UniProtKB/Swiss-Prot annotation:
Top EC class, one word: translocase
Site (Required for activity): 362
Disulfide bonds: none
The protein's assembly and partners: F-type ATPases have 2 components, CF(1) - the catalytic core - and CF(0) - the membrane proton channel. CF(1) has five subunits: alpha(3), beta(3), gamma(1), delta(1), epsilon(1). CF(0) has three main subunits: a(1), b(2) and c(9-12). The alpha and beta chains form an alternating ring which encloses part of the gamma chain. CF(1) is attached to CF(0) by a central stalk formed by the gamma and epsilon chains, while a peripheral stalk is formed by the delta and b chains.
SUPFAM superfamilies reported in the protein's UniProt record: C-terminal domain of alpha and beta subunits of F1 ATP synthase, N-terminal domain of alpha and beta subunits of F1 ATP synthase, P-loop containing nucleoside triphosphate hydrolases
Stated family: Belongs to the ATPase alpha/beta chains family.
EC numbers for this chain: 7.1.2.2
Organism: Staphylococcus aureus (strain Newman)
A Pfam match: ATP-synt_ab_C
Protein name: ATP synthase subunit alpha
Residues bound to ATP: 169-176
Gene Ontology terms, MF aspect: ADP binding; ATP binding; proton-transporting ATP synthase activity, rotational mechanism
Membrane topology value: Peripheral membrane protein
Amino acid sequence: MAIKAEEISALLRSQIENYESEMSVTDVGTVLQIGDGIALIHGLNDVMAGELVEFHNGVLGLAQNLEESNVGVVILGPYTGITEGDEVKRTGRIMEVPVGEELIGRVVNPLGQPIDGQGPINTTKTRPVEKKATGVMDRKSVDEPLQTGIKAIDALVPIGRGQRELIIGDRQTGKTTIAIDTILNQKDQGTICIYVAIGQKDSTVRANVEKLRQAGALDYTIVVAASASEPSPLLYIAPYSGVTMGEEFMFNGKHVLIVYDDLTKQAAAYRELSLLLRRPPGREAYPGDVFYLHSRLLERAAKLNDDLGGGSITALPIIETQAGDISAYVPTNVISITDGQIFLQSDLFFSGVRPAINAGQSVSRVGGSAQINAMKKVAGTLRLDLASYRELESFAQFGSDLDEFTASKLERGKRTVEVLKQDQNKPLPVEHQVLIIYALTKGYLDDIPVVDITRFEDELNHWAESNATELLNEIRETGGLPDAEKFDTAINEFKKSFSKSE
């Protein structure tokens, strides 16, 4: 079969016309040194600060130290497969994490990869992990309450949407319990919760996830877990990943609650990275920018103005102290950044006062304007009553004779402490809180034995659910305080049926 010359030339012409020259230029470098999750790279002359670089085995790294002749990279994953002389290439992108509704109900690592064994997360939207905080003019004053369901907090140190409220205390004083209870109380409140576990044991993270699942709270919660077994870079970026996921909801007009549990471990991970990168150490061996580490994170919590949709991120950072020392470097830094703190005391915890909140050292600098009117009115004198009780309590230990007024103050104080106690995983709706605190401050509990206070409260709540629904609904729907007459009638009626212990 003869092939004509014209056919050959036409075939060649079509091939040449369809030919596309694909030439890609990749900036590459070479690993000079590797160890402890840090790689020293020669080359990569045009790499950006915070840019992702890719090693030959697919593991990613984050460019941190940009020096004259080399680049210090922290490795975001296992580094045992990387050796000296390996090739490293730029990706041209800064670190991003997946965001969106698809993440709700899932447990992910700080890179946004699922670790709960429930398959891939089908979202294509991403956001950069490092982002400038919302500007001054885009914000609005905190004016909406965020109910925690914990009497001692909602009455004494109220939290508003868009606030940063620090939870601080020694280990084993109930810090995580307060955070988890607050998440449980957001059910049916239209709030999306993000729980960031930093440097905790895998078993602890699993227990908290199960607690959330059993209470049905995973339906509106994302868990970002960087456990103690993970490399330091993942512990360092975990909070930023969490708040990035939250910002997606905030900018869509939704309300977000984010818990960082805890930032002490994040600061320790950052200290480790900084020392390995040979950055000069400062106080307590932390690098000079450890304040900025936390301020740029916590400033991303905000209440947006109405033009931007009125969304919010409320942050509850947790800090662990050593022997109650809140004057250490990281605690003082975070106290100065946040809008108040809830201080948990181990002495109170071990004496059975749980949550072990020290009312004297706990404060909410902006939450007062967000507190509902009903609570503001009934709990107005509570802090003062507690303070005077603590003072009189130490005075009464000397066993001197007490006048009638002092004795009544002490008795009221004992009942106040008892009312503010609360079991874990049992958040209380705000209308029930107002009811029991009203009964306390108006003297209705003065004739109830201290041992009966908890039972009195439980039975009052059950009784009110069926016999004082109008009263509860009025508080829930309007936020205002009903007539004193309605309260007095309801409480007196219940007291007739309540039997005191002998």
